[in-house]
Amino acid sequence: HVGLVGANGEGKSTFLNIVTGHLQPDEGKVEWPGKVSVGYLDQQSTLEKGMTIREVLRTAFQGMYEMEQQMLDLYDKMGDATPEELDKMMNTVGEIQSELEHSGFYSLDAKIEEVANGLGLGSVGLDRDVSDLSGGQRSKVLLTKLLLQNANILLLDEPTNYLDVEHIEWLTKFLQNYEHAFILISHDITFLNSVVNVIYHLENSNLTRYTGDYNRFQEMYAIYKSQQEAAYERQQQEVAKLEDFIARNKARVATTNMAKSRQRKLDKMEMIEKPREKIKPTFRFNEARTPSRFIVEAKDLVLGYDTPLTRPVTFNLERGQKIAIRGVNGLGKTTLLKTILGLIPPVSGKVELGEFLQPGYFEQEEREKNEKTALEDVWDEYPGLTNYEVRAALAGCGLTNEHITSKVFVLSGGEAAKVRLCKLMLKDINWLVLDEPTNHLDVDAKEE
């Protein structure tokens, strides 16, 4: 039960894409033994419109349904078969029947409902069209389907994003009892500590294996780092001494052989790489002028699109208040934010905004595929800044030069979130509206 950890942009999702064959490695090869079944939850998977949740979940057992169809086809053909053919068909049907019973085919619907309820899909309704679901609910459908496949190895990329607390608890128990292997990417430390017994740490394109949970890894990593730094310093001192000796003695006849000997020693030395400082992001928001006392006044507000999502609500938001909005997925938290910001109209009721308001809105996800580089994306929004200033702002959010010059749509979820945070930080703001800002962010970025 492996936890794959590392800062945003180190290549965790890329690693999973390489081992699943979605990307080609630059060198080397990936081999899976023939009978190993692999289940992959990718951050960016999509669902087909027109299917219900139940129909999507049943596709987890596609192979079994195909076997059942093969058996039914054989029954249809039996009426026209010769005695010899009939014998063969009966044998094949018996084998299929036995395989289906052994695999629990006849209790699949109960199994589907058990896992769907565990992740909170029961309350959504399994007969709903997947195109009607919120982003969080779609993620739950994909995760449920994956868990139902009972693969020999699960590859899970941030499975707790969009899960409510009770469903994270259910998933924790499920993974603790999972009889097969899994590789898990997660920035939720409590969750990681509960389910993994091995950590693979990805840093500077190197994978290092640690046994134990995330806390144990942190202890071991701190020791390893200090040993690396000490070894690097010792070697640098030795190199300096050798170079000094060579420079002073290579020209003198009496000592030239000793100088050559030292040069050979220096040439053979395996150089220790200087430990790289981890880039830590800093998030600071520019404050605009002070707004009026009341930021938002909502009266008899009903949220929704075509149909109401809520009963009428009345509330005030005052300057200086720090408010958290909680509730299960699909209840309308994002809709509430968009309604009070004036991005979508309420079904009924009214919203009044205060004076001198300059909101900064962080959306959960970008809707369109962003073809711009991170540099272009920020610069287009702030054309008055110099190239250096835009690069400095992005670097301050923990992005490297490689990220800054990459197209936004190829960045990992965490890197893309940092680009959006960067744009917010360059704006004068007196009211922050943040929709799941820490989804995809690594541990350091979350803390900061």
Predicted regions and their residues:
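Post-kinase regulatory C-tail/linker adjacent to protein kinase catalytic domains
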Residues: 283-285
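Intracellular alpha-helical coupling/juxtamembrane segments of multi-pass membrane proteins
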Residues: 220-275
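ABC ATP-binding cassette signature C-motif
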Residues: 1-230, 279, 288-448
